[in-house]
Design a protein with these regions (language model features):
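N-terminal leader/targeting segments and the immediate start of mature chains
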Residues: 16-54
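Extended lipid/amphipathic-ligand handling interfaces
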Residues: 33, 58-60, 194-196
Length: 247
């Protein structure tokens, strides 16, 4: 009886270990990353920061995400407000008319800055499609590599852009990202996060912003191009005066 019982225990133990080693899905990796970066705090906290001499505010109003950009032109204070798919521009608190084409351009600009500042939170938006590409080594460390595309319905004007994210295999923090785009002649960008800090529980980073030397490079190979020093530094993406408050 003992001879049967002992092997049975060994089989059960091995089965449990195999279950524990089941590979993570793209969704699980993103969920863990969001939890580490702020989790539910994104949903009930207002954030403020400055980027290139403009102020940005993100808040939640009756369940809707409201994104703002505030800056001055001479003595006029301009406030751009994106609520869902709606856009409004105020000049010294007075609403001004903006053509649909210009409103779309301004709304995309506001959304883009907030999107990168709030990462990885936006990666669970309904239009996002995630695909785990495996693991990749960048600068000597291993990362989960996830490709992100968007549904045309709800994916915005740039729904056909392709993004790639690299998440640390140990702590799930997104340390690198890349994307291809089609506006203004198109191109690719690769960003390396640095200067990580948590403000009232929400993670913020700055980025070194690179582009490939070869404009026809494959976006899925851009991590290895970075390893080979085949990217050139374009700019630094730096957020200042960050504040986080409960709504």
């Amino acid at each position: 009886m003992k001879r049967i019982f002992v092997p049975l225990l060994l089989l059960l133990s091995l089965a449990c270990k195999e279950k524990q080693k089941a590979p993570l899905t793209a969704q699980e990796i993103v969920d863990k990353s969001i939890e580490d970066s702020g989790g539910k705090l994104y949903e009930d906290h207002k954030t403020f920061f400055e980027f290139r001499d403009r102020k940005y505010v993100s808040e939640n109003n009756n369940g809707k995400k409201v994104l703002k950009r505030i800056f001055k032109v001479d003595s006029v204070t301009i406030t751009d407000v994106k609520t869902g798919n709606d856009f409004q521009r105020f000049m010294n608190d007075s609403l001004v008319a903006v053509s649909d084409s210009i409103a779309t351009k301004y709304a995309n600009s506001v959304n883009s800055v907030h999107y990168f500042a709030r990462l990885p939170y936006g990666l669970n938006d309904p239009a996002v499609k995630k695909e785990l590409l495996g693991k990749e080594t960048i600068e000597g460390k291993r990362y989960h590599k996830i490709k992100v595309t968007f549904d045309q319905n709800g994916g915005g004007e740039d729904y056909d852009d392709v993004y790639v994210y690299w998440f640390d295999v140990e702590n799930f923090k997104p340390m690198y990202l890349a994307y291809s785009f089609h506006v203004d002649g198109g191109g690719q960008r690769f960003r390396k996060a640095y200067n990580e800090r948590y403000v009232n529980g929400i993670r913020f980073v700055d980025y070194d912003n690179y582009k490939p030397k070869d404009k026809d490079s494959d976006i899925l190979q851009i991590g290895q191009l970075f390893n080979k020093e085949e990217l050139e530094l374009l700019s630094k993406i730096e957020l200042t005066d960050i504040k986080v408050e409960q709504d």
